[in-house]
Amino acid sequence: MNDIQNREDVALLVNTFYTKVRANDELGPIFNTAIKDWDSHLIHLTNFWESQLFRKNVFSGNPLKKHVEVDKNNNNQITNDLFGLWLQFWLGTIDELFEGQLANLAKDRARNIASFMFMEIFRSRQEK
């Protein structure tokens, strides 16, 4: 098995992962309601992860703001367990497709992002 080597590998990871997320009974309804144009969003997410893994400046956006909005639109029902499920799918998809230094970096970044996002979403709920 190879490591993540280029944008095409990142796109494979992102597309495979979100196919699972969209079909999941718990995560699917949240994502499928929030995202109207999946083709565009998958490109956007590929840009995000390409930026994270290869330090390329191809992503623009504010993921934290978007996730806070999604939580608000779901009556503040996004839980740490849902982030854990998201992370479980991400780590499992990486393990199915890749191994190596960048694969491990993608796992580490996702762990950090999930923790940070949930903490910031929780904090934003306190600001009401």
Regions found by a protein language model. Give the residues of each.
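Core of compact, soluble alpha-helical bundle domains
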Residues: M1-K128
